[in-house]
Swiss-Prot record, chain A:
One of its GO terms (biological process) is glutaminyl-tRNAGln biosynthesis via transamidation. Keywords: ATP-binding, Ligase, Mitochondrion, Nucleotide-binding, Protein biosynthesis. The keyword Acetylation does not apply. It holds the Pfam family GatC. Allows the formation of correctly charged Gln-tRNA(Gln) through the transamidation of misacylated Glu-tRNA(Gln) in the mitochondria. The reaction takes place in the presence of glutamine and ATP through an activated gamma-phospho-Glu-tRNA(Gln). Belongs to the GatC family. This protein may be expected to contain an N-terminal transit peptide but none has been predicted. Its EC number is 6.3.5.-. It catalyses: L-glutamyl-tRNA(Gln) + L-glutamine + ATP + H2O = L-glutaminyl-tRNA(Gln) + L-glutamate + ADP + phosphate + H(+). The keyword Ligase applies. It is found in: Mitochondrion. This is Glutamyl-tRNA(Gln) amidotransferase subunit C, mitochondrial. One of its GO terms (cellular component) is glutamyl-tRNA(Gln) amidotransferase complex.
Amino acid sequence: MNRFFKIVLTSTRRASTNGSGKRKTPFEGDKVHIPDEPYNSKVRFFICFKKKLKHGIQIDESLLSEMPPIDAKLISHLERLSLVRFDSEQAVANLRNSIRMAKRLELVDVEDVEPMHTVWESQECPTFDDVEEEPLPIDKVFRNAAVRFDDFFVTPPGNVPLESNERFDLNVINKWDTIGKPVAPEAKTIRLAEGRRK
Amino acid sequence: MWRRRFATSAATTTVATVSRFKPVIGLEIHVQLNTRTKLFSRCPTSDASPNRRVAPFDMATPGTLPALNHQCVHRALKMSRLLKCHVPKWSRFDRKHYFYADMPAGYQITQNEYPIARDGLFGYWVFGEETDTPYWKEVEIVQLQLEQDSGKTINILDSSPSESSESRSLIDYNRAGCALIEIVTSPCFETAIEAIRFVQTLRLLIIHHNLSDGELHRGHLRVDANVSLTVDGKPGTRTEIKNMNSIRTIHTAINFEIARQFEILSNSSGKVIRETRGVDSEGRTVPMREKDAEDTDYRFMVEPNLPILKIRKEWMEGAERELETQGIADFEWLRDRCGFDPRSSIHIAEEPDLLAFVKRCVRFKDSGVTADEILYWMRELKTIMQRSKGNYPPKSDFFAKQFTTLIHHSGRLTRLRLLDLLRFYATSSESEEDVLLEDVMEFIDKNDFWRINDTEKIDKFVEESMAKNGKLAEKVRSGHAKSFNKMRNLMIETSEKRIELEDAEDAIRRFLQR
């Protein structure tokens, strides 16, 4: 607790003094909201959602909904949504951990609170006249293009079906955090390949 | 081969539909607006070679922000009024995510939860083959939303089996970010005809009010159809037919899909899979390559870069004012003001040349000429022009005037004479000699082409013709049918087509009975 206020106070004080190496704000005297030093986020949790937490700064994991088991179907669903491929059990296990961490947000009381969609909530959408402006010159359009064919961008064909999803040892992924190892074991495929080599 | 198979399956559908199956069709129509610039950037939308109409925002350059085009909102408001939609006080934009190379941001900005308009009603006439009586149908409009178009993809497929396949896609972003209005109807159509008449009527209205250029073949109007069959009143699984861009395709594809589903369902163990289907060049629906057996998750989220769009009162008034000054569309004018039937009014309004001709005719129309008469004689004129290899319809004002005058006096001329005069005026005015031509009334008066109604006069023609052609007269007297016709034609010919066919026949019969 005390540490948190100390951090906030020091950061505000630092911002208001002018000197080299000091934090600067666009307007002098503005508050700096990002602290200079990291602090334990659990402290913040405690301050904001005191009511929901039972034992002080510790988050009661039993209040959270259960982790869904990660299966081949879920992995392929996530890969399709993100267009990112998991390259190992470790990657999936990391994601699983992140999901577990994010689940803490379930404890936030959002009853009768409209979600915030934009920082321009009180504004109206501005509209613009239908007046043409010069489009980008062709060389600028292609400045970042890796491959160009005549005046077209070139991409790999779309709608490529994803490969089989039975690539990972699901047991390892789902148990990793209870095994207690900092890094998940290597992917099954690699192990198998190495085993064969041996 | 396919046609025959298709025809039989379609026929069985209609029979069986009565007993167990009923098609249910809903449409999604994407209308490309003809604004000068795109929906969220001021990049011009005019035609150009690939990737010449691209602003940084259109290719999702990081750091660029959407700037909403006011004209698009204006046109959407006009469209909402045309479709009698409810326009809420505000609407909002959403992101719909999917990965396609022609959608560079990885999402499309559209309106999902709070569209610009909803709950509309649109009435139109449905007519089928020539014999059907048209009926009025009202379609519920679920919602109307503004959204971005995607770019265009050219797929280059390499069929060689080698692993280093050369398959790739070429992308043109000229269309990316252009403004679309998507019109979503409730699943209230029961036949393909109902669906296509709706699209046809809507298209004419859209063009009239300058919302879109409405050229189907150029993709200004793209239609998706959701088709399912209810079995004994229970809703069935639907399939979605994507991206149809001609009226004929919509018609055949929907019918094909109904027939296909019917064939599956009439087999007791058959099951229709929920899927997206494309259309091949023959109008058959084929499964699309993409697999979306499980429902695609678009991860809709509110577009954070666009605040809420509040619809101001003066915007609404402006849209209404403009609709009023624009007046009714041509097909409505033909139908409601000139008395053309629903089928012809749509048909004429769809063909600019025909429309111009009919407009000219209506301008010169004497009070006695009805729409049906104009239509009847237009059909005759079409045959004449086809035979004489002239252009139909003739373009000159002069001809239109003579045409309506002739129709007005059609009761006083024989049919053959009228056709002759039409041919003469149509072919001569086509060759730009009309300056030399006199008015048809003067022409008729001068040559005395008026129909002979006096039976005594006609009888005289019979007597003369019979006397002149002794041999033929013998045959006619003996009851030879061919000779009878020959004699009749001879008579008409000598009278310079002033005797009506029936009159001539009656007169010969009278003569024979004497």
